[in-house]
Swiss-Prot record:
Protein name: Translation initiation factor IF-2
Region (G5): 590-592
Gene3D superfamilies, per the entry: 1.10.10.2480, P-loop containing nucleotide triphosphate hydrolases, Translation factors, Translation initiation factor IF- 2, domain 3
GO cellular component: cytosol
Region (G1) residue spans: 454-461
Region (G4): 554-557
Protein's organism: Streptococcus thermophilus (strain ATCC BAA-491 / LMD-9)
Annotated segments matching region Disordered: 29-349
């Protein structure tokens, strides 16, 4: 019998796959997911049980008719509660009336302001009860008074009141009536109309009178409190005076008692009350009285006196006298400070220092200075410095303290210290981590983001080409996708966002970036090639990102296609099909002929439904940069993937280390749009610089905050780059010395997009040629310009253009300066070319090659020549230009060059195997019988 998948049964019955899986498990079938297979009989059982369940539900009566009596019972409870609540409300209102009546009692002390406001209130009541006639007369009088022009401010105020029908003051003192006539008649007519309207509307609430009464009550209460306070202070002062007087009297009595006791205890022989002593005291008093200067009589001739005193009495009639008084030396010494002029300056009052209580809590930040802490806790910096010194910390008032020291200091003061959590406005990552940023009630279903991964030329771009009905693959050089493309298609009313990642080994970072923002990975494997290195790498990226994998076995139309082999190879790497009991879906397709494409899309939507992908479109947009480039007309263009929120045109945005405002926004079809929701890929313009691919972006509340955050991020990135200094240590000393001996190939990289720049620079730095390394002097996005040529000339570098061309001026300058420009469109050709250039820069490397061995049979000593060794070749051959080693008992005794080589008496170039001959060695004569002569040459190694 044939088998059926559960999702096929769900499609036939018209229910969700989850319901079918639950029903199958309820019937005792061993199924795991919607893609599990069951027999035809089991499928019929599932459908019949579902139909029976729906029939039972229809046969049951509607259970929603019963709750009505419950609602009727609830109503009287609500009424009782409201009645119960109304009773205390009435009681409280009575209590409020009593309190108000107590508060309205006339104060004991007379408050003129309160009386005046009470009179205003009574006047307002009388005017309200009097009707329109008196009011009209008063308005008439106010108009007459209001139109009189006088310089008095009170008349100006009355004029304003008359214009607004509020002239209620008696301006009877004004008798000027210049402005009368038509204007006054019109105003009177308006007043009559207003009075008639007031009479029709009935009595109005006079808010001014009510405010005046309330103010009067407040003033009365304040005056009553002031009077009570004054009386209490006066009584306290009297008590203090009485206590002081009592203490003074007690002190005097105590002194008198002490004197009496002293007089009683002492005997009489003491000298008498000493008249001679009293006499000198009287003389001293007389002399002092004589020294007091007598009162001088007023000088009658002072009028004729000349000098500053005379001018002071005359109050200085002219300006010259004032200037002379200021510049004269008459009173110059009066303002001097010194021993003789102490009485001239009044004593300064010493203000007592106020005592401030310590706070109970102290919120600190890392790096606070001593002065800041002293200001916060209301203490002197010297006191804190002293405490720190006692704790063993030497600090000044301008020195910053770390968090631990601040906490210890606060413990010494008995204050609870807490570290202030500062929100970093420049931190974009907090939007992706903070769960409170999203509103869970506003979550909606979003489109899945699908990344297509696989090895080079396995059909990724062809699959996207088939999905979008476009010819993307024809534009790629060598059939290789150079940078990420983001596209969105619609299937069955639902949207799917696709990311196309490059498959070449150089684009590892770009594949990892694609896996980090994706929801589902479609791993495309060619049925004829099988699993390749980049296929394994894509599997690892997907597993690291924790996203489900759907395997698309492509090129099944080829005759040598073997899908079963692909399934087995993937199982070895942990990707197991659901048919084998795994979690990964396998779909056999042919991207070229469009075979089973619909089935692949349905599988993607099913997996997305199981994943329950949701987003909040109400918040400010956040997401990731897919790609960035520089356009000649538009400037920096960035391809963004919105992950949460909604991105709008004119939004202030921070992207990586740059910022700007969304000037224009286009979708994947090149059409201009104004908004982009979650999972939508868009290209925007308006940034200051081209960001890095993989950077996060976030929309801020205003442009000022976005500018501050962008500038702060750029500054931090620059500081981080400056701090990356490589210092020499014992561990890397040898590597540093070795790097100094290495030769370098300087290159300047210019590419069309940022992702290609990163991939190309990383690939060139990874080229492993011993003795030579690549130094990337500069890398950027855009065309090759004159500044690049100037930099290449200064640094002796090669300019590499990837999918870009030099400007005419740059080309002409390169020819003049003899700077080499290499233009490429396929990355592995660039790598091969640079690798060959690096190999050509190396010094020739030689390898030792042993060509023969000989054994010394006899030695001959010649006085002028030295020791001649007669030998026999045992292996290989001995040549005249070869080097020779003398080996004795397995140990190398000497290594040098042959001086001569003879066969019998003839000089020869070489002696072959099993032949005899004679030789001499340069600068060595200690040749002995049975020594082994090893001949070798140095050959150059090709790299």
């Amino acid at each position: 019998m044939s088998k059926k998948r559960l999702y096929e049964i769900a499609k036939e019955v018209g229910v969700e796959s989850k319901v079918i899986v639950a029903k199958a498990q309820e019937l005792g079938l061993s199924v795991k997911s919607h893609s599990s297979s069951v027999e035809e009989a089991d499928a019929n059982r599932i459908t019949s049980s579902l139909k029976a369940g729906t029939a039972k539900d229809e046969s049951k009566p509607a259970p929603k008719a019963t709750p009505t009596p419950k609602e009727e019972k609830v109503e009287p409870k609500v009424d009782k509660a409201s009645v119960a609540k109304s009773a205390p409300a009435k009681e409280t209102s009575k209590a409020e009336v009593k309190e108000a009546s107590v508060a309205l009692k006339k104060p004991k002390s007379r408050n003129f302001k309160a009386e005046r406001e009470a009179r205003a209130k009574a006047e307002a009541e009388r005017r309200k009860n009097g009707g329109g006639r008196d009011n009209r007369n008063r308005n008439q009088q106010g108009n007459d008074q209001g139109k009189r022009h006088n310089n008095d401010r009170r008349n100006q105020k009355g004029n304003g009141q008359g214009d607004h029908n509020k002239g209620n003051r008696d301006n009877s003192t004004n008798h000027d009536r210049n402005f009368q006539g038509k204007l006054r008649n019109d105003q009177n007519q308006n007043n009559r109309r207003d009075n008639a309207r007031n009479n029709q509307a009935g009595p109005r609430i006079d808010l001014k009178a009510r405010a005046a009464a309330l103010k009067a009550e407040q003033n009365a209460e304040y005056s009553r409190q002031s009077e009570t306070r004054f009386r209490e202070e006066k009584a306290a002062e009297q008590r203090r005076a009485k206590e002081q007087e009592k203490a003074r009297k007690e002190k005097q009595q105590a002194e008198v008692a002490v004197q009496k006791a002293a007089a009683e205890t002492k005997p009489a022989p003491k000298p008498a009350p000493v008249a001679p002593q009293s006499a000198p005291t009287a003389q001293v008093q007389d002399t002092r009285r004589k020294k007091v200067r007598p009162n001088k009589s007023r000088d009658n001739h002072r009028v004729n006196e000349d000098g500053p005193k005379q001018t002071r009495n005359n109050k200085w009639n002219n300006q010259n006298q004032v200037r002379n008084q200021r510049n004269s030396n008459w009173n110059k010494n009066k303002n001097k400070k010194g021993k003789n002029n102490r009485g001239n300056s009044a004593p300064k009052l010493v203000t007592e220092r106020k005592f401030h209580e310590l706070p109970k809590e102290f919120e600190y930040t890392e790096g606070m200075t001593v002065a800041e802490i002293a200001k916060r806790i209301k203490r002197e910096p010297a006191e804190i410095v002293k405490k720190l010194f006692m704790m063993g910390v030497m600090a000044t008032q301008n020195q910053s303290l770390d968090g631990d020291t601040i906490e210890l200091l606060m413990v010494d003061y008995g204050i609870e210290a807490t570290k202030k959590e500062e929100v970093d406005n420049a931190d974009i990552e907090r939007f992706f981590v903070d769960e409170d940023y999203l509103n869970k009630d506003a979550m909606v279903e979003r489109a899945p983001v699908v990344t297509i991964m696989g090895h080079v030329d396995h059909g990724k771009t062809t699959l996207l080409d088939t999905l979008r009905n476009s010819r993307v693959a024809t534009g790629e050089a060598g059939g290789i996708t150079q940078h990420i493309g983001a596209y969105q298609i619609e299937e069955g009313g639902k949207k799917i966002t696709f990311l196309d990642t490059p498959g070449h080994a150089a684009f590892t970072s770009m594949r990892a970036r694609g896996a980090s923002v994706t929801d589902i990975t479609v791993l495309i494997v060619a049925a004829d090639d099988g699993v390749m290195p980049q296929t394994i790498e894509a599997i690892n990226h997907s597993k690291a990102a924790g996203v489900p994998i759907i395997v698309a076995i492509n090129k099944i139309d080829k005759p040598d296609a073997n899908p079963e082999r692909v399934i087995g190879e993937l199982a070895e790497h942990g990707v197991i099909s659901t048919a084998w009991g795994g979690d990964s879906e396998f779909v056999e397709i042919s991207a070229k002929f469009g075979q089973n494409i619909e089935e692949l899309l349905e599988t993607i939507l099913l997996v997305a439904e199981v994943e329950e992908l949701k987003a909040d479109p109400t918040v400010r947009a956040i997401g990731t940069v897919i790609e960035a480039r520089l356009d000649k007309g538009k400037g920096a263009v960035a391809t963004l993937l919105v992950q949460q929120g909604t991105l709008n045109v004119q939004d202030p945005i921070v992207v990586g280390n740059t910022f700007g405002r969304v000037r224009a926004m286009t979708n994947d079809l090149g059409r201009r749009i104004k908004t982009a929701g979650p999972s939508a890929p868009v290209s925007i313009t308006g940034l200051n610089e081209a960001p890095m691919a993989g950077d996060h972006f976030a929309v801020y509340e205003d442009e000022k905050a976005a500018r501050a955050a962008g500038e702060e991020r750029a500054k931090r990135a620059l500081m981080k780059q400056r701090q990356q200094t490589h210092r020499v240590s014992l561990d890397n000393l040898f590597d540093t010395l070795k790097a100094g001996e290495m030769k370098t190939v300087n290159v300047i990289i210019k590419a069309d997009v940022q992702g290609s720049v990163e991939a190309l620079a990383a690939s060139l730095l990874k080229i492993d040629v011993e003795g030579v390394r690549v130094n990337v002097v500069h890398s950027a996005v855009g065309a090759i310009n004159e500044s690049d040529i100037t930099l290449a000339e200064a640094s002796d570098a090669v300019v590499i253009g990837f999918n870009v061309r030099p400007t005419p001026q740059a080309r002409q300058q390169a020819e003049t300066d003899e700077v080499e420009i290499r233009l490429h469109s396929i990355i592995y050709k660039v790598i091969e070319e640079i690798e060959d250039a690096m190999k050509g820069m190396l010094d020739p490397e030689f390898e030792e090659k042993i060509i023969g061995e000989a054994v010394i049979r006899e030695t001959f000593k010649v006085s002028k020549v030295g020791t001649i060794g007669g030998f026999m070749v045992t292996n290989g051959k001995i040549t005249r230009d070869s080097s020779a080693r003398v080996i004795r008992d397995g140990v190398v005794i000497f290594d040098g060059k042959l001086a001569s080589l003879k066969h019998y008496k003839d000089d020869v170039k070489e002696v072959g195997n099993a032949q005899e001959g004679g030789l001499t060695i340069e600068n060595y004569n200690d040749i002995k019988v049975d020594d082994v002569i090893e001949a070798y040459i140095m050959e150059e190694i090709k790299r």
